[in-house]
């Protein structure tokens, strides 16, 4: 779909220099060649765009995300995560209500040795996007690393409940519920010694699984 969309842009299109920079970067990402090389080239392109247009916070977010994407399965992952997190925090300082900045900072610092760097973003993110069940859940990644079990529990509970509201509003199958948050909630209850609540969570998921199978 991306390749088709790019091919539909005429070379004579009257676009700004910045818009053309974005298009060229995207062409690199979805162009020919091995994926890891394209990912690296795209990341460098987004770095140039962000440096060229420092007020373009979205460019910074895409640059941060590109580094996070490259940090998987590489010996250089820690450096890339720290760099991605630093960029996300820079954007977060410029705009404390930027959802992507908070989101990517949490992902970047989702390690025991880095988690404190993401604590401010974790405490802020849920209030930035209250209708997003993923935004409600994500702070738990930092809270869990720091052993903040009550806070992690609340994040996952809110993620689960918000997803229920979303499924009901959109009138979609129950498979759309955020079972990732529910599973994390189960784990948090176990860590807190709240075994009855953990059992209740398990029964909820089992019930939904059975209903989902029967509806097919």
Name each region found by the language model.
Residues 1-11:
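Active-site-surrounding "flap" and adjacent substrate/cofactor-binding loops of secreted or lumenal enzymes
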Residues 1, 14-33, 54-73, 95-109, ...:
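Amphipathic alpha-helical repeat scaffolds of TPR domains
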Residues 47-51, 86-89, 93, 122-127, ...:
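Amphipathic alpha-helical segments of tetratricopeptide repeats
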Residues 151, 156-159, 175-209:
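Extended catalytic-interface subdomain
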Residues 39, 81, 114-115, 149, ...:
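TPR-repeat structural position
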Residues 27, 34-51:
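Asp-box/WD-like beta-propeller blade repeats and closely related beta-sheet repeat scaffolds
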């Amino acid at each position: 779909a991306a390749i088709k969309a790019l091919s539909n842009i005429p070379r004579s299109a009257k676009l700004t220099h910045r818009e053309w920079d974005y298009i060229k970067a995207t062409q690199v990402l979805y162009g020919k060649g091995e994926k890891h090389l394209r990912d690296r080239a795209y990341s460098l392109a987004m770095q140039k765009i962000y440096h060229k247009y420092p007020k373009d916070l979205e460019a910074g977010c895409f640059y941060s995300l590109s580094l996070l994407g490259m940090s998987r399965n590489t010996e250089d992952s820690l450096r890339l995560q720290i760099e991605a997190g630093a960029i996300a925090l820079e954007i977060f300082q410029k705009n404390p209500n930027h959802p992507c900045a908070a989101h990517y900072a949490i992902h970047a610092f989702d390690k025991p040795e880095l988690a404190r760097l993401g604590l401010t973003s974790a405490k802020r993110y849920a209030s930035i996007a209250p209708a997003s069940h993923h935004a409600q859940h994500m702070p738990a990644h930092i809270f869990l690393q720091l052993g903040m079990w009550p806070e992690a529990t609340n994040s996952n509970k809110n993620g689960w409940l918000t997803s229920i509201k979303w499924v009901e509003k959109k009138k979609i199958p129950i498979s759309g519920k955020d079972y990732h948050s529910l599973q994390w909630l189960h784990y948090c209850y176990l860590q807190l010694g709240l075994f009855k609540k953990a059992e209740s969570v398990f029964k909820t998921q089992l019930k939904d699984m059975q209903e989902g199978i029967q509806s097919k």
